[in-house]
Amino acid sequence: MTITLRPGTTVMFTGDSITDLRRPVDEDETGCAYPLRVAGEWCFRHPDRPVTWLNTANAGDKVVDLETRWQTDVLDAHPDVVSILVGVNDMGWHTLDPDGYVIPVEEFQAGYDRLLAPLAAAGTQLILIEPFLLPIDGVVEAGVASVGPEERKEWRADLDPKIEAVHALAEKYDAHLIPADTMFAELAATTGPEYWSADGVHPTAAGHHALATAWLRLTT
């Protein structure tokens, strides 16, 4: 099953910095990440089907942060399609939090569920993108974090059950799923992970193109 984007459809992207990528907060812009590539390619292919593209992603957001602004930033816009990529900031949060707080997978899944429930009730079509982590060598800067082999190992152990939670929610709400973590692992097997993400978290231009291509495969 694919999503048919008819004339007048409103598509909303939301999440964290991977989706945000320098989106002006005071303008109706899609930013410089994969949403811009999706919108550009779609508009090029289908000039006869105008679609409204919205992006309310915010760098640094976790699921709990999305919850605080969900009504005003997402629900009040009454989008027909909502695409969500969140979880990278929930992953390994204890390595950044001064109190060392670990975000349990149950808390992550319950919060994510609360985001999806009102959208599903309204008949909104949903696209969930797995959070992902590529195995970059050495110590790299990922946002405000310095990530080395030990941190990366902790992050991966924390991320895997959260990916499974996204799978469970996609099944519960009959959402379309983009298995981004699996996709990047397969792509990195031939090129090395740095080709797709310099820090293991934020995609390169090629990484954003890969996400956009996977997204567009879900639409007609």
Task: Give, region by region, the residue ranges found by the protein language model.
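Short beta-strands and strand-loop turn motifs
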Residues: 15, 21, 56, 129-130
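Glycine-rich beta-strand-to-loop/alpha-helix junction loops that act as flexible
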Residues: 14-16, 59, 86-88
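Alpha-helical cap/lid subdomain in secreted, periplasmic
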Residues: 4-7, 37-52, 65-220
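Short glycine-rich His-centered loop
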Residues: 3-29
